[in-house]
Amino acid sequence: MKKTLRFAAVAAGLVASLITVAPSASAQALRAQGASLADEVVAVVNNDVITGRELDQRVGLIARRLQQQKAPVPPTDQLRAQVLNQMVLERIQVQRAKDDGIVVDNATVQATLGRLAQANGMPLDQYKARIEAQGVPWDLFVRDARTELMLSKLREKEVDSKITVSDAEVASYIASQRGPNAGAQQDLRLEHIFVKAPTNAPQADIDAAQKKAEGLLQQALASGTNFERLAKSQSEADDAKKGGDLGFKAPSSLPSDVVDAVSKLRPGEVNPTLIRVPDGFEIVRLVDRRASQNPAASPKIVQTHVRHILLRVGEGKSESQARQQLIDIRRQIEAGGDFEKFARTYSQDGSASQGGDLGWISPGETVPEFERAMNALQDGQVSNPVRTEYGYHLIQVLGRRDAEGSVQQQMDIARQAIGQRKAEQAYSDWLRELRDSSYVQIKLPVGQ
């Protein structure tokens, strides 16, 4: 299987992992949140509306999800406003997708649901039963899955497909990682003050945040201002208590806008303009520069040492039989059985004679389903049965290591990192422009 599995992976499927098992609030909980608002319009979005019932359902789901994750649940007013804003952005994008003729067929939705069921270690019928047992109607779950897929296709069409990365940018990125010669690269020590203003926030909130940030910038630029003290009292970043001190950072680890801004500064100077980042506004002060502590570093790849047991479907073995056999084998391994012996006995892959050992695998060398499952495992952990085009697998990760990789792998990593950074910024800009060009009227009553 090593030779069979190790081919360049095709583009991964749409991001099914975004759609997780999360129960909706019960009807009783929804009523408690304000039954009188159930059918009241809380937002007008172009020619569409969002009702109180829809908002309550989404708020209940998110509140339950936060509780499950043991994360703090914001005050009701704040949570409702945040969720409504998310729903407005989602509705605008769905409208745009429909205008663009983007559709998601049933086969694609079913394939996504199948991957979700597999990721949760169960067949689709069991997965459906679990979703419904947790209070989420299956048709609602399927609809949300279809929406996620539609928005992924929209982003691919409107944003991601238009991102280009030149060979010169790749070369520059690699050079910034390695340095043209020892000691040539300089790490930067920065302090910053951050004011939150997510791109998807209401425009009024963004304007207010910008006004606050501009006031803080003027204070930071004023003679005699203690930047560290100002950051401690005003910054909304997690490092505010440290005076916004980021420590020394390699330029490649910082947003390009920040690097460009501080490149013109002398130590001790504050950048004279605000820097817009996806989550808000940054005020940056250059504290110091120093020769890179790792000038020869190259872009690294993470290799995974993995072994597996493969059962092929067909040849007298059905889908359910192959899957059940691997469930039984996994149960025995978890009880202390020897993975290697099971692989030698049952695996139908060429690696069976090596106990299923595939050696060290680099990113992109396996099919996407196998790689996603492998990447989700901790060292020593055994997966649930994983379906690929080859059959069903049990996968065990034996270890991970950083490796420099080939020249081509380094270029691929650089291109991916640059493209990802560009795509996130482009998506934030596009989403802001899309909202600005839409008619949105928020009717959410104050205190509800």
UniProtKB/Swiss-Prot annotation:
Entry GO CC: outer membrane-bounded periplasmic space
Pfam families the UniProt entry points to: Rotamase, Rotamase_3, SurA_N
Keyword Signal assigned: yes
Protein name: Chaperone SurA
Residue span(s) of domain PpiC: 185-288, 301-399
Keywords: Chaperone, Isomerase, Periplasm, Repeat, Rotamase, Signal
Superkingdom classification of source: Bacteria
Catalysed reactions, as listed in the record: [protein]-peptidylproline (omega=180) = [protein]-peptidylproline (omega=0)
Organism field: Burkholderia thailandensis (strain ATCC 700388 / DSM 13276 / CCUG 48851 / CIP 106301 / E264)
Presence of keyword Signal: yes
Domain comment as written in the entry: The PPIase activity resides only in the second parvulin domain. The N-terminal region and the C-terminal tail are necessary and sufficient for the chaperone activity of SurA. The PPIase activity is dispensable for SurA to function as a chaperone. The N-terminal region and the C-terminal tail are also required for porin recognition.
Disordered as annotated region, ranges: 230-249
EC number assigned by the record: 5.2.1.8
GO terms, molecular function: peptide binding; peptidyl-prolyl cis-trans isomerase activity; unfolded protein binding
Record function comment: Chaperone involved in the correct folding and assembly of outer membrane proteins. Recognizes specific patterns of aromatic residues and the orientation of their side chains, which are found more frequently in integral outer membrane proteins. May act in both early periplasmic and late outer membrane-associated steps of protein maturation.
Signal peptide interval: 1-27
Organism ancestry: Bacteria, Pseudomonadati, Pseudomonadota, Betaproteobacteria, Burkholderiales
UniProt subcellular location: Periplasm
BP terms from Gene Ontology: Gram-negative-bacterium-type cell outer membrane assembly; protein folding; protein stabilization
